[in-house]
Structures are given as C-alpha cells and as structure tokens.
A protein has these predicted regions:
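Short acidic/polar hinge/loop motifs at secondary-structure boundaries
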Residues: 14-42
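Gram-negative outer-membrane beta-barrel transporters
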Residues: 336-337, 442-445, 462-545
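N-terminal periplasmic accessory domains that precede
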Residues: 9, 24-30, 45, 50-77
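Membrane-embedded beta-barrel scaffold of Gram-negative outer-membrane proteins
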Residues: 206-210, 411-465, 470, 588
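Conserved C-terminal beta-signal and adjacent last beta-strands/turns
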Residues: 92, 134, 418-420, 494, ...
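Structural signature of Gram-negative outer-membrane beta-barrels, strongest in the C-terminal barrel
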Residues: 252-254, 267, 275, 312-444, ...
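Periplasmic-side early beta-strands and strand-to-turn transitions of outer-membrane beta-barrels
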Residues: 68, 94-184, 220, 448
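Face-selective signature of the C-terminal outer-membrane beta-barrel domain
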Residues: 136-152, 181-355, 438-441, 489
Length: 588
C-alpha cells in the first residue's frame, strides 16, 4: 500500500507523519526511536479490530520499561553513536517504580546527497528528542507519558546537473545550470499521557490523551537553463529554460482521548475501546512551473500565456472523528487436547463528521497448532477494512483558465479492502541450530479507490472515488542460525496490485512485482568479539509516468532496485552475565 495506507501505533496511540513532504531528501528521522523499542508487531493484512482504519498494514510499537532485577534498586543503560550521517545519544534509568528513557538524535544526509547527479549545496538538518516516563506507585496504578519534538530543516542550493541517457548507438546528454534555492522546515510536536487502573488482577481500565501538532513550510524558487545534445556528434538538439516556484504552508493539529477496558478469563481476552478525535488542518499553497522552449512559453497557443503547471489551494479542515471497537481472543483445544486454537474476532465502528460517513468493519482470524506437529502454526484471516480519509485524500482539483485549484471534496467516501489471508509457520532444528520458515498468501479486493500518483515520496490524490482493483501476493521467509549464536534471514516475495480506472487496467504506483532480501551475520575466525553483517536487496522497479500527467500514462517502470550493505562491530566489554568486572580485564 501507499504511505498513507499503513497505520503506526506507539503504546496504543496512532502516529502521524508530515503532510507536505515530497522527496526522500526532505524526510528526517523516523517517529519510532529504535533505542526505546521493546516489542514490534507488524501485520500485512487480516489484523485485529483494535488497529485503525487503514487498509494495507498495521505496525504496533511498544516502548520498553527498565526495571532492576533481583536485589538491585536501580538499573541504567545508555548509548552514544556517531557517523558521517549524524549522531545519537540515549540514556535510560529504572527503579522499582519508575522507568525513564531519553533519546536525542541528529541526522544530516548531505554527505550522501553530494553523490547525486545534481551538484548543489545540501544542508539538511534533522533533530529529534523523545522521552518516555512510566511510573507505577503500586500494583493498581500506572502512569505513562511519551513526548516527542522533531525539528527538520532542508536547505538546497543547486548548481548544475548532467545526465546521459539513450542506447550505446544513440547517446544523448542533458545539462542544466541552476539559479535559486529551496528552504523547507517541518516542525512536529507529539505527546501522550496514559493512566491505567488495574481494577482486579484480570480487569484494567485505561484513559489516554494525546496531541499532535505540525507546522510545515516549503519554499523554493529555482530556475534551470538546459541543453540537450547528441553526444557522438556534439549536435545541439534543443535549449530552454524552466522556473519552479512554491510557497506552501500547512498547520495540522489532532487532539484525541481514548478509553480502553480489558478483561481476561481463562479462555478469553476481551477488549473494548472508544476514541474521540478533534482535527484541524489549514493549508495555503501556491505552486507553478514555467517552461520556455526556443523563446516560446509552453504550452503555446498563440493567444494566451499559460504555465505548464499552476496550482493554488487555500483550505481549512475542522472535523470530529469517533472510533470504537470490540474484540475477543478465544483460546481453546480440540477434544483430547491435541490441537490448539486461537480465535480472534471483533468489529470496529467509526464516524467522521465531515462526510457524515459511518463505517462498520468486522474482522476474524484463526490460529491453529495442529495435533501432528507442535512446531507448526496455521493462520487464516478475513475482514472488511476501510481507509478513512484524512486530508490529502480530500483534495480535489479543477482547472480554470490554465490554473488548477485544489479544494476539499466533503462528499468523498472511504476506500475499502476485503482481506483474505492464509499463513504457515514451521519451526525446526538442523544440527541443533534453530530455524523458522514462514509463508503467507494474501488477496485483497479493493473498492471505492481514490486514485493517486507518487512522485518521489509525495502522494497526490484525485480527490474522487473513481477506481476498483486488487492486491495479491505471497511472502516466504527463512529465519535462523545459519551461524551458531547469530540471526540471519532470507525473504522472497511475489506481488501484483492493479486498479481499473476509466475502464483501463492500470498498475498501482506500489506494484512491485518481486523482492528478494538477505541478511547474514557471522563471526570472524577465532573470535566472537568481531562480527560482520551483510544485507542484500533486489526488488522490481515501480511504475511511473511523466509529471502532471494522468495515471493512465503509467507506462514506464523504474529499473530494478539493488542495494548492498556491510557492517562490522567489535565488542569491547563482555559482561553478558551481569557481574562486576574491571574494564581493563574485559578489554585485554
């Protein structure tokens, strides 16, 4: 699915991402801090009713709590890291009642951007601070707080670019000289406060309040003068100029309150929740692109002066959203107790005040550990999922006198997806080394789709329900100790996703037909202090079309994606048993 079709949760609270980001160069640090993560749950389909109204996948992150073991009263841990791409610092403190994690991260990818075809002054600076405080005064009460501040700056002053393309017999050269600059800023605040009361050992009630605020601006004025030449003959094929301008400003604020009631019995885990959200988004955007070819502004009709692209948007969204779900996890065995079953079933309901739409989403999944093998797990899931619109999906465009105006379509409906999932999991040993093989096949019937195009990481929607389609595939993964004491894995995926738009079959922008990934770790001979990690990736290219064109022109496909990463680490201190030792004894 697209970026907006995947839900991300941190400690039961949904996380949002910036709305104006258009390129990977502008993207900063992930909202998920890897130093603070305890558990990760991910599902590509057939997920439970407690996960929100997204129709592709759900990522559930739980931050860790530090607690001393045994007779210790406190425990601390920390990390310092530095590289050509930035620096990180993390510190955690834990007592019997309190756990406090703090992390600050800084990233700059100017070193990598300097290797691209476009020679420029890249000054991206991304700063992120996160804190997680958990306090348990007694066994009945728990208070959690998560705070996050993210300040991302992207400054770009291009100089020139030269690209060659064509065949061996017909090589062409494209040169551009630039004037101007780009200045962007994405400032985000996120916070959540949760209070949990354990009514009994089997029943708990939680209240969570969260706030998300984002202030974004994207400003650029860049002129490019280009030459297109035939390389072999040095013949000039064309000259021209283009000018790109943007003044985009956006402010987003989402406040939410959530109540969760959980109750456990011998065979059932029942969970019910209600969420109320208040959303406010304001946008003021102006973009245009002028192209001059041989002294004529394109497009040229001999009468009026038009831009190749011009867009204006001044929109405000004020809406309330209500969500509720009820789910139960029922565990039982067959007669004789040889086969074990886990049945999760539930229903999710949501209502949005903007389009007056009420959605019901039933979901069910069944996990089976068959009698013939306790190392085998079978999983089947099905459900009806909706992609509740947020902001970008609402933006509908109309063109008047060569100018495109973006307005909000308040009558839009939620796209839907019907999931059918079948999975297989088998754990085994070879030479007393652990291995795990998983396979999953899925089919998703898509309806009421809002078509969208992707340019880099910017997603632009049509603003109307105009298509239907499907997504299908199979994922295979082998995980295990290829080398004793290390973890490695190999994955292989086959995928296909298409939609029917205006009577024509069109691949969705996410139609990546295959992918192969390998992660391998090994020790250096004679020592376990030195460790090497190797990661290889090969994936099919994604479909694309020329800018500002209809999706029906998605006739191009990018080359296959290839990547190799290698890393090495050396363990200075070996204190895995937790005993106090001299630092020098550990090193030498």
């Amino acid at each position: 699915g697209a970026f907006d079709e995947n839900s991300v949760y941190i400690n039961n609270v949904e996380v949002y991402r910036p709305l104006l980001v258009r390129s990977g160069q502008q993207e900063g640090l992930s909202a998920i801090n890897p130093y603070m993560v305890d558990k990760i749950g991910f599902s590509t389909g057939g997920y439970a009713a407690k996960y929100g109204d997204k129709m592709s996948s759900a990522l559930d992150i739980t931050y860790k709590k530090l607690q001393p073991k045994g007779s210790k009263k406190t425990v601390t841990e920390g990390t310092l890291a530095a590289s050509l791409l930035g620096a990180d610092a993390y510190f955690g403190l834990g007592t019997k009642k309190l756990s406090w994690l703090n992390s600050i991260r800084y990233k700059t990818n100017s070193y990598l951007l300097g290797t691209t075809d476009t020679k420029a002054e890249y000054k991206p600076n991304f700063l992120d601070y996160q804190t997680y405080l958990s306090y348990c005064p007694n066994k009945r009460w728990k208070i959690d707080f998560i705070g996050n501040i993210s300040d991302n700056h992207y400054n770009f002053v291009p100089h020139d670019r030269e690209t060659t393309f064509g065949t061996q017999q017909d090589v062409k050269s494209f040169r551009v000289y630039f004037d101007g600059q780009e200045k962007d800023r994405f400032l985000t605040y996120f916070g959540t406060l949760g209070i949990t009361r354990n009514i009994t050992d089997k029943t708990s009630f939680s209240i969570l309040g969260s706030a998300f605020y984002s202030k974004e601006q994207e400003k650029y004025d860049i002129q490019g003068q280009y030459w297109l030449d035939q390389t072999e003959t040095s013949e000039n094929l064309g000259v021209g100029t283009y000018f790109e301008h943007a003044r985009n400003y956006l402010t987003a604020r989402v406040l939410s309150a959530k109540a969760i009631l959980k109750h456990k019995t011998k065979k059932h885990d029942i969970e019910v929740a209600y969420t109320y959200k208040k959303e406010h988004i304001s946008e003021n955007s102006v973009e245009y692109e002028m192209r001059d070819s041989a002294g004529y502004s394109v497009p040229h009709n001999g009468k009026d002066l038009y831009m190749i692209y011009s867009m204006k948007a001044r929109n405000t969204l004020d809406a309330n959203r209500m969500e509720a779900y009820l789910q139960d996890t029922y565990r039982f065995t067959s007669q004789g107790g040889h086969s074990h079953f886990t049945l999760n079933y539930g229903v999710r309901m949501s209502h949005w005040s903007l389009n007056k739409e009420t959605l019901f989403s039933p979901r069910i999944s069944l996990g089976i550990i068959p009698a013939y093998s306790e190392n085998t797990t079978l999983r089947f899931a099905a459900g009806l999922y909706y992609q509740a619109p947020f902001f970008k999906e609402l933006r509908d465009t109309s063109t008047v006198n060569g100018i495109t105006y973006a307005t909000l379509n308040e009558k839009i409906k939620s796209p839907r997806s019907i999931h059918f999932i079948a999975g297989y999991d088998y754990r085994f040993r070879i030479n007393n080394q652990r291995y795990r093989f998983t396979a999953e096949a899925y089919y998703k019937a898509l309806g009421n789709l809002i078509p969208y195009s992707v340019n880099n990481v910017k997603v632009v929607y049509y603003g109307e329900n105009r298509a239907s389609g499907h997504a299908a595939g199979i994922d295979l993964k082998l995980y295990g100790e290829f080398v004793p004491g290390t973890d490695s894995w190999l994955t292989f995926s086959l995928m296909n996703t298409q939609m029917k738009l205006n009577g024509k079959g069109v691949p969705l922008p996410t139609d990546q037909r295959f992918a192969v990934n390998l992660f391998f770790t090994d020790y250096f001979p004679g020592t376990e202090r030195w460790r090497m990690s190797l990661k290889l990736a090969l994936a099919d290219g994604l479909p694309f079309s020329t800018p500002h064109r209809e999706l029906e022109t998605n006739t191009f496909r990018a080359p296959a994606y290839k990547r190799a990463d290698i890393g090495m680490s050396y363990r200075l201190l070996d204190n895995s048993k937790g005993t106090k030792k001299s630092i020098f004894k550990n090193i030498w």
